[in-house]
C-alpha cells in the first residue's frame, strides 16, 4: 500500500457540474491517534488546520514528513483546486468518506517541516515581543 499525502477535509456535497463541494480544511488533531502509524507506512505530507501532537511531530521528523496548513473558511475557493475526486472507502460516511483527490495549485503554507520546526510555536514567540 502506498500512502503519500493527506488533506483533512469534510466537503459539502457537490452541486451539478462541480467536482466537489466546498472543501476547506478540518482540524488535523482529530487524526493524531492514527497519524504516527501512517507516517511509518509512508505518508509524507498532510494538509489541514491546527496544531499537531508531540507524537505526530516526532513521527514526522523520523519519517521526513511535512504538515501544511490551508486557510480555514476558504472552502469554496480551495475546492476549485480539486480537479478530480473519487470516493475510495467508507462511502456510507458521506462527507467523511475517504477520497482520492487530484489537486493543483492548492494555496498552503508549511507549518511544520521535516525537522520539526513549527511555525505555530516560532510565530508565537516572535509576535509575543
Predicted regions and their residues:
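Short glycine/serine/threonine-rich phosphate/pyrophosphate-binding segments
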Residues: 29-31, 49, 53-58, 75-77, ...
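General beta-strand structural signal in soluble alpha/beta enzymes
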Residues: 7-9, 46-49, 67-70, 89-90, ...
Amino acid at each position: 500500500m502506498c500512502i503519500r499525502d493527506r488533506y483533512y477535509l469534510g466537503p459539502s456535497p457537490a452541486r451539478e457540474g462541480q467536482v466537489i463541494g466546498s472543501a476547506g480544511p478540518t482540524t488535523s488533531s482529530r487524526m493524531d491517534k492514527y497519524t504516527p502509524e501512517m507516517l511509518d507506512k509512508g505518508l509524507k505530507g498532510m494538509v489541514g488546520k491546527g496544531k499537531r501532537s508531540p507524537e505526530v511531530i516526532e513521527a514526522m521528523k523520523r519519517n521526513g514528513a511535512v504538515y501544511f496548513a490551508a486557510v480555514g473558511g476558504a472552502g469554496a475557493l480551495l475546492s476549485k483546486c480539486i480537479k478530480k475526486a473519487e470516493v475510495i472507502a467508507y462511502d456510507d460516511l458521506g462527507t467523511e468518506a475517504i477520497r482520492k483527490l487530484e489537486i493543483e495549485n492548492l494555496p498552503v503554507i508549511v507549518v511544520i517541516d521535516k525537522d520539526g520546526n513549527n511555525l505555530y510555536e516560532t510565530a508565537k514567540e516572535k509576535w509575543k515581543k
